[in-house]
Amino acid sequence: MQKPKKDKVSYLCTECGDSFAKWYGQCPSCKAWNSLSENRFVEGPAGASAGPAEGAKLITSTVTAEPLVKTGLKQFDQILGGGVMAGAVILIGGEPGIGKSTLLLEVLRHAPGVYVTGEESLAQVHARAARLGLKENLDIVQGNSLAQIFDYVHAKKAKLVLIDSIQTTYTDQRTGFAGSPAQIREVTQRIVEFAKSNQVAFLIAGHITKDGQIAGPKLLEHAVDTVIYFEQNPTSRYRFLRAVKNRFGATGDVAIFEMTATGFREIENADSLLPVQEIGGIGSCLFPQLEGTRVMPLEIQVLVTPTGFANGRRIGENIELSRIHLIAAILE
């Protein structure tokens, strides 16, 4: 009589993604404290095999590369290396409300695909699409189950899938709630396997923590092909897309967008970011800063007042104080 299978238990570090057979207060790999969480999964039947692997020699291979999918956003395509490659898994991280969902909908304006929402209702997504002026026949589906998402993509024969978000998607192959380290790890691995085997590109939105890192184990960033961070100044309407990992292009490139009532507007000329005023007057100067392949003009403003103390006090905003001390020492 065959014994029932038992759940295997391991402990997953939410910081580095390594797993261990027992719990530690401090991760042996990355030395983070209280970062290990329980991970349960059912082991498959012994000796199970997915069949022999199929491949071809690179020199004699007749496989032709599929054309890149253009998103319609010129700067976004440039960051991705010219467009979205078939089978690529792209992770877009950013704070809540920064515009990740809007960016994914903007992609559907020019690139046909399936939009999967796990955070909002269909009515909410359609309302945003109408505000952006998108066509009505968008393929939008609400769901959180990864198996159902794969079935829908197979039925539609879609080549581009946009998931909002990775933290709300779950798989029945792992225990735990959606968004837990174990679920995020398993969902990510299965998406990557599905994307590569079916030549389907995935654009995935992800939340970030208070430290500015994408929520979930580090394996999430290691497994995907491209990691893009959505950044903003809290007092500005401008948004910055920065590639920190890219298997198909350069890293460090920056795309600049302006958030408007009808969606994102690309900023081609970075000079327009500076307000038209007395630039270069007393107490201010401009200097060019290289961001990837773009030159960004930045303004430095200095205000000096007399002091009654022996040593003056230096305060810096949006610049490290140690750098101010270094510049002051050089000038003196």
Feature locations, PLM:
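Substrate-engagement module of ASCE P-loop NTPases
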Residues: 182-203, 207, 223-234
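Conserved inter-motif catalytic segment of the P-loop NTP-binding fold
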Residues: 95-98, 102-190, 307
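Conserved P-loop NTPase
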Residues: 28-32, 36, 42-46, 51-56, ...
